[in-house]
Amino acid sequence: MFAVIKTGGKQYRVAANDVITIAKLEGEAGTAVTFGEVLLYADGEGATQVGAPTVSGISVAGEIVAQKRGPKIIAFKKRRRQNSRRKRGHRQDFTVVRVTGISAA
């Protein structure tokens, strides 16, 4: 059994006990989260439901494992012969989530 969910502008194929890294969600480690935007649902017996755009009555439950930050990305801009340069660093925040189950309501 698996589902395709949409969160943070991206789509993820998830099954029970999967650990996924997604865009930052608010909450501490151990907090329960629910994903309601399910785009596709397939049970183990070959039946598949494809949403237009979402499948109603299906939700994916998960638990926040950790809040982390990605590697530092350096943006460097230089104008030659002008003694002008700018350096900026950026670290993207993301959330690690463990999928606890897929439920049909």
From Swiss-Prot:
InterPro entries: bL21-like (IPR028909), bL21-like_sf (IPR036164), Ribosomal_bL21 (IPR001787). SUPFAM superfamilies: L21p-like (SSF141091). GO terms for cellular component: cytoplasm; ribonucleoprotein complex; ribosome. GO terms for molecular function: rRNA binding; structural constituent of ribosome. It holds the Pfam family Ribosomal_L21p. Keywords: Ribonucleoprotein, Ribosomal protein, RNA-binding, rRNA-binding. GO terms for biological process: translation. Part of the 50S ribosomal subunit. Contacts protein L20. This protein binds to 23S rRNA in the presence of protein L20. Belongs to the bacterial ribosomal protein bL21 family. PANTHER family: 50S RIBOSOMAL PROTEIN L21, LARGE RIBOSOMAL SUBUNIT PROTEIN BL21M. This is Large ribosomal subunit protein bL21.
